[in-house]
């Protein structure tokens, strides 16, 4: 029987923190982020940009940047809003969320900018 490995992420070590599903993979390139946003658009989900302080990243509440972009289908517009949010809140984590109207829940979300860890 093999031994169970310890989970290496610790709250006391901010560099080890993981966020969202894709955080266990290598960092996404700009093109890969673009593909993820294109997927959100292709599913008909409503994109939104959210941000929070690194110390609150594990909480359920992230601040919404403006309103959700209802019906937005231009990937560049969505990415520019995420960039504007990051420039306005440079120390915060910024994520893009795809809201699924049919299931009335988040279809997906991914952190596109990581803030400065404490």
UniProtKB/Swiss-Prot annotation:
Keywords carried by this UniProt record: Calvin cycle, Carbon dioxide fixation
Xref: CDD domains: RuBisCO_small
Ion transport listed as a keyword: no
Any single biological process term in GO: reductive pentose-phosphate cycle
GO molecular function, one term: ribulose-bisphosphate carboxylase activity
Matches recorded under InterPro entries: RuBisCO_ssu, RuBisCO_ssu_dom, RuBisCO_ssu_sf
PANTHER family: RIBULOSE BISPHOSPHATE CARBOXYLASE SMALL CHAIN 1, CHLOROPLASTIC
Family the UniProt entry places it in: Belongs to the RuBisCO small chain family.
Record's subunit section: Heterohexadecamer of 8 large and 8 small subunits.
Function: RuBisCO catalyzes two reactions: the carboxylation of D-ribulose 1,5-bisphosphate, the primary event in carbon dioxide fixation, as well as the oxidative fragmentation of the pentose substrate. Both reactions occur simultaneously and in competition at the same active site. Although the small subunit is not catalytic it is essential for maximal activity.
HAMAP family according to UniProt: RuBisCO_S_bact
Note: The basic functional RuBisCO is composed of a large chain homodimer in a 'head-to-tail' conformation. In form I RuBisCO this homodimer is arranged in a barrel-like tetramer with the small subunits forming a tetrameric 'cap' on each end of the 'barrel'.
Protein name: Ribulose bisphosphate carboxylase small subunit 2
Biological source species: Acidithiobacillus ferrooxidans
């Amino acid at each position: 029987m093999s031994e169970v490995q310890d989970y290496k992420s610790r709250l006391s070590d901010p560099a080890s923190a993981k966020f969202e599903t894709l955080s266990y993979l290598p960092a996404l390139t700009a093109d890969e982020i673009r593909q993820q946003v294109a997927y959100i658009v292709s599913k008909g989900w409503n994109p939104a940009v959210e941000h929070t302080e690194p110390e609150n990243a594990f909480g359920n509440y992230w601040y919404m940047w403006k309103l959700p972009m209802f019906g937005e289908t231009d990937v560049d517009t969505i990415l520019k809003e995420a960039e504007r949010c990051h420039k306005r809140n440079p120390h915060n984590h910024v994520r893009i969320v795809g809201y699924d109207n049919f299931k009335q829940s988040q279809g997906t979300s991914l952190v596109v900018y990581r803030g400065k860890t404490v």
